[in-house]
């Protein structure tokens, strides 16, 4: 009986495996979009990465946007973090997408860099969306 259940589970996992750009992704989760918006009067440096992907360094003008899309992994452990800077001054490194926190909060996750820190917005309105304060 155990062998039959094991074979059925392996078959289901095999059916859920998807091919994309030459890579195999088993049972991927929902497509998620992250956007960072600079609402400051200065240039904002942004460098985002995950364990597997490095999105490189970007400079956002006032009103500038930077974003990307990804699939949340089926283990719900997807994590992206971003470092922020103003000129040569580090403003902080923060978890911009953390599946255990954000998968139920947003599929379109918008982050707004303001004078005092990073504000997070999703489909469900939050009373105080200030997630992270800048380092002083």
UniProtKB/Swiss-Prot annotation:
The gene is SPH6. It comes from the Eukaryota. It comes from Arabidopsis thaliana. Glycans are attached at residues 76, 108. The keyword Flavoprotein does not apply. One of its GO terms (cellular component) is extracellular region. Keywords: Glycoprotein, Secreted, Self-incompatibility, Signal. Its main location: secreted. It is found in: Secreted. The lineage of its organism: Eukaryota, Viridiplantae, Streptophyta, Embryophyta, Tracheophyta. It holds the Pfam family Self-incomp_S1. The keyword Lipid biosynthesis does not apply. Belongs to the plant self-incompatibility (S1) protein family. One of its GO terms (biological process) is rejection of self pollen. This is S-protein homolog 6. Residues 1-17 form the signal peptide.
